[in-house]
């Protein structure tokens, strides 16, 4: 009896091992063969390029070592109707679908579109290609790929499915007519999986209240839960899901903290011009809204005498008055004094910018333009007064109010040279007179001594 049991046990276990070897033949020997080096690295890379199916791991121990999590649920297929050629191909590819005639005849473009969808990953990673209850789903070539680079494996899987689909279509003989509402219910499990995947996604109308012009309308055969999105809405939905916080106004993100520098305030001002009043009032507390004083906040949020207006007046009132009489301070040259005053005004403006609340970009540009105009006007007035003073010192141009600046400069140079020559002449005459005085004094002393 023991001998019979020993003989029957391997015989009973033989079909399991044979079936397992047949199912995982690609993972049994061919996948391990390139890892045996043949004394050269070139042979290893050459064998790896020649092999059509090459998973990155030699055995299941690598998969257990990395312990990769399953892929996240993907968005539903972009195909809007269930009666489309992609759905018919899916129904024929699905192991659970009922084979009711091969799914009809398709053109080359439809077949290429189905292959593109399969290679794109929208159908390879779903449950209608590999049954999750089956043991082969755990040992699938694509799931075994720990680096998710099984493009060749996906290509082979798609080619096998297409071959089986063409064989089924040849066996069916004549193509079946177009599917109606009854044909759409052949793969109810696929509908459940697709509706479950669609229910986990966010409706684009919730995230984006604005209507999408290129959104496709569902066909009559499609279920309400499996309505597909257009490429633009699908990309917007993926970006909204990946963002840390999704709000009805996507332009109003990251605006809760007030800026501290002038560059940050300018960026904040550009963002505040694009958002509406309601979003600003929700994000900013009442104290910040009253201090900001933005023109879009309404009349109640801006006090009649805000510190912003007072500081702007402070810049204009404390400027140097050149029409006032000169003070007792040290007099600098005209150009240097203009530079000092302009630097003082710019320093006051920069301090007021740091202390004031953020303003709009238009107000900032107006302030800069006004400051530049004030400084330029002061420079021109100072230069004009200097020329007028120089003209008044020249005897030839003293009464000529329309004398040009070039004439004033030339006459002033000639007058300075003549004055210097006259000065030298007067100095020489002074020396002669002093010597003459000394001689007369000496002669007077001699006369006094002789008369005594």
Curated annotation (Swiss-Prot):
Gene Ontology MF terms in the entry: core promoter sequence-specific DNA binding; DNA binding; DNA-binding transcription activator activity, RNA polymerase II-specific; DNA-binding transcription factor activity, RNA polymerase II-specific; DNA-binding transcription factor binding; DNA-binding transcription repressor activity, RNA polymerase II-specific; E-box binding; identical protein binding
Compositional bias (Low complexity): 220-251
Residues where N6-acetyllysine is found: 156, 161, 170, 288, 330, 336, 384
Compositional bias of kind Acidic residues: 264-276
Record note on quaternary structure: Efficient DNA binding requires dimerization with another bHLH protein. Binds DNA as a heterodimer with MAX. Interacts with TAF1C and SPAG9. Interacts with PARP10. Interacts with KDM5A and KDM5B. Interacts (when phosphorylated at Thr-71 and Ser-75) with FBXW7. Interacts with PIM2. Interacts with RIOX1. The heterodimer MYC:MAX interacts with ABI1; the interaction may enhance MYC:MAX transcriptional activity. Interacts with TRIM6. Interacts with NPM1; the binary complex is recruited to the promoter of MYC target genes and enhances their transcription.
Chain segments annotated as coiled-coil in the UniProt record: none
One GO-annotated biological process of the protein: negative regulation of gene expression via chromosomal CpG island methylation
Modification after translation (UniProt): Phosphorylated by PRKDC. Phosphorylation at Ser-342 by PIM2 leads to the stabilization of MYC. Phosphorylation at Ser-75 by CDK2 prevents Ras-induced senescence. Phosphorylated at Ser-75 by DYRK2; this primes the protein for subsequent phosphorylation by GSK3B at Thr-71. Phosphorylation at Thr-71 and Ser-75 by GSK3 is required for ubiquitination and degradation by the proteasome. Dephosphorylation at multiple sites by the PNUTS-PP1 complex promotes MYC stability by preventing ubiquitination by the SCF(FBXW7) complex.
Name by which UniProt lists this protein: Myc proto-oncogene protein
Glycosylation sites: 71
Source domain of life: Eukaryota
Residues modified to Phosphothreonine: 71, 328
Further comment found in the protein's record: Alternative translation initiation from an upstream, in-frame non-ATG (CTG) codon or a downstream ATG start site results in the production of 2 isoforms with distinct N-termini, shown in this entry as isoform 2 and isoform 1, respectively.
Domain bHLH residue range list: 367-419
Gene3D superfamilies from the UniProt entry: Helix-loop-helix DNA-binding domain
């Amino acid at each position: 009896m023991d001998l019979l049991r020993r003989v029957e046990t391997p015989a009973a276990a033989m079909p399991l091992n044979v079936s397992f070897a047949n199912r995982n033949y690609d993972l049994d020997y061919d996948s391990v063969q390139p890892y045996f080096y043949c004394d050269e690295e070139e042979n290893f890379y050459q064998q790896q390029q020649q092999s059509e199916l090459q998973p990155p791991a030699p055995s299941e121990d690598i998969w257990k070592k990395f312990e990769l999590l399953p892929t996240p649920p993907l968005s539903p297929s972009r195909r809007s109707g269930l009666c489309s050629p992609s759905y018919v191909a899916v129904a024929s590819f699905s192991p659970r679908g009922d084979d009711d005639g091969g799914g009809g005849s398709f053109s080359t473009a439809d077949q290429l579109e189905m292959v593109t969808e399969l290679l794109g990953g929208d159908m390879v990673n779903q449950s209608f290609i590999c049954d999750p209850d089956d043991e082969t789903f755990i040992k699938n070539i694509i799931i075994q790929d720990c680096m998710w680079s099984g493009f060749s494996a996906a290509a082979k899987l798609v080619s096998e499915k297409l071959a089986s689909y063409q064989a089924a279509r040849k066996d069916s003989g004549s193509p079946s007519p177009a599917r109606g509402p009854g044909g759409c219910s052949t793969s109810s499990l696929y509908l459940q999986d697709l509706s479950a995947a669609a229910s986990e996604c966010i409706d684009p109308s919730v995230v984006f209240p604005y209507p999408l012009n290129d959104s496709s309308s569902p066909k009559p055969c499609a279920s309400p839960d499996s309505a597909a999105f257009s490429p633009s809405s699908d990309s917007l939905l993926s970006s909204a899901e990946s963002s840390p916080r999704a709000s009805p106004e996507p332009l109003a993100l990251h605006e809760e903290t007030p800026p501290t520098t002038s560059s940050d305030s300018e960026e904040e001002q550009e963002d505040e011009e694009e958002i509406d009043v309601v979003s600003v009032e929700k994000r900013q507390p009442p104290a910040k809204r009253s201090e900001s004083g933005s023109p879009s906040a309404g009349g109640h949020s801006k006090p009649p005498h805000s510190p912003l207006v007072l500081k702007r007046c402070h810049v204009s009132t404390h400027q140097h008055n050149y029409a006032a009489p000169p003070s007792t301070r040290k007099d600098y040259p005209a150009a240097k004094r203009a530079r000092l005053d302009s630097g003082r005004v710019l320093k006051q403006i920069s301090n007021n910018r740091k202390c004031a609340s953020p303003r709009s970009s238009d107000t900032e540009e107006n302030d800069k333009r006004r400051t530049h105009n004030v400084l330029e006007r002061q420079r021109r007035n100072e230069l004009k007064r200097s020329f007028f003073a120089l003209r008044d010192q020249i005897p030839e141009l003293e009464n000529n109010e329309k004398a040009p600046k070039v004439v004033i400069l030339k006459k002033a140079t000639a007058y300075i040279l003549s004055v210097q020559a006259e000065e030298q002449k007067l100095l020489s005459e002074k020396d002669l007179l002093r010597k003459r005085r000394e001689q007369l004094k000496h002669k007077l002393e001699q006369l006094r001594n002789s008369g005594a």
